[in-house]
Amino acid sequence: MNVFRILGDLSHLLAMILLLVKIWRSKSCAGISGKSQILFALVFTTRYLDLFSNFISIYNTVMKVVFLLCAYVTVYMIYWKFRKTFDIENDTFRLEFLLVPVTGLSFLVNYSYTPMEVLWTFSIYLESVAILPQLFMISKTGEAETITTHYLFFLGLYRLLYLANWIRRYQTENFYDQISVVSGVVQTIFYCDFFYLYVTKVLKGKKLSLPVPV
């Protein structure tokens, strides 16, 4: 396990913690897409079904458990604990537009037709597009709170670091996972515009705002 993998995991974990802290401290989930969080919870659930049957390392197991807990606690806070603050009017992305093609693709393009492998592939494809409801929500409202932009930045950084991890593994281990790499590139592309706005606005102390579609 190389440094890019570890830094990627830490960036991912930091993003999730930032989101949880934001919701808990403000007692509000305004500006957060519950649909994206449901998709992320589904990603971790389908990816980590081998949690108790395939031991790799203590680090790997602990991270799986932590990611699952963070994902489901986030969903709980959005849809139960602070549901009165949930911005349902703007969280309107149609999940079937993602779930249907992702499900179909996971059956068509995978490494083997076993239930665990198909579900793992499904989780990889779904993660690459799970952030779209959140980005759609931001484009619809025209702005995002600073803490939300930090959350998105560290999610995007996690993906960039994982791309570096795969490059490093190819160089040192001659290992190449086409499904993960292609999906990771697609996911990173979705963050490109956001990265630009983050650097030019948020890091300069300005609020991230976008033109509201008519």
From Swiss-Prot:
For the region Interaction with the K-D-E-L motif on target proteins, what residue ranges are annotated? Answer: 47-48, 159-169
Where does the signal peptide begin and end? none
Compartments, record wording: Endoplasmic reticulum membrane; Golgi apparatus membrane; Cytoplasmic vesicle, COPI-coated vesicle membrane
Site described as Interaction with the K-D-E-L motif on target proteins, located at 5, 117
Give the residue ranges for region: Important for recycling of cargo proteins with the sequence motif K-D-E-L from the Golgi to the endoplasmic reticulum: 204-207
Which ranges of this chain reside in the Cytoplasmic compartment per its record? 25-32, 80-92, 136-149, 200-214
Membrane-spanning parts: 5-24, 33-52, 59-79, 93-110, 117-135, 150-168, 179-199
Hey, where's the site called Important for recycling of cargo proteins with the sequence motif K-D-E-L from the Golgi to the endoplasmic reticulum on this chain? 193
Q: Which superkingdom?
A: Eukaryota
Membrane topology (Lumenal): 1-4, 53-58, 111-116, 169-178
Single Gene Ontology BP annotation: retrograde vesicle-mediated transport, Golgi to endoplasmic reticulum
**Does the record bear Transmembrane helix in its keywords?**
yes
For this UniProt record, give its keywords in alphabetical order, as a comma-separated list: Cytoplasmic vesicle, Endoplasmic reticulum, ER-Golgi transport, Golgi apparatus, Membrane, Protein transport, Receptor, Transmembrane, Transmembrane helix, Transport
Q: Which GO terms describe its cellular component?
A: COPI-coated vesicle membrane; endoplasmic reticulum membrane; Golgi membrane
Task: Supply the InterPro entries for this chain.
Answer: ER_ret_rcpt (IPR000133)
Please name the GO terms that the record assigns under molecular function: KDEL sequence binding
Q: State the membrane topology.
A: Multi-pass membrane protein
Its biological purpose: Receptor for the C-terminal sequence motif K-D-E-L that is present on endoplasmic reticulum resident proteins and that mediates their recycling from the Golgi back to the endoplasmic reticulum.
Q: What is known of its domains?
A: Binds the C-terminal sequence motif K-D-E-L in a hydrophilic cavity between the transmembrane domains. This triggers a conformation change that exposes a Lys-rich patch on the cytosolic surface of the protein. This patch mediates recycling from the Golgi to the endoplasmic reticulum, probably via COPI vesicles.
Q: Name the family the entry cites.
A: Belongs to the ERD2 family.
Q: What is this protein called?
A: ER lumen protein-retaining receptor 3
Tell me what organism the protein belongs to. Mus musculus
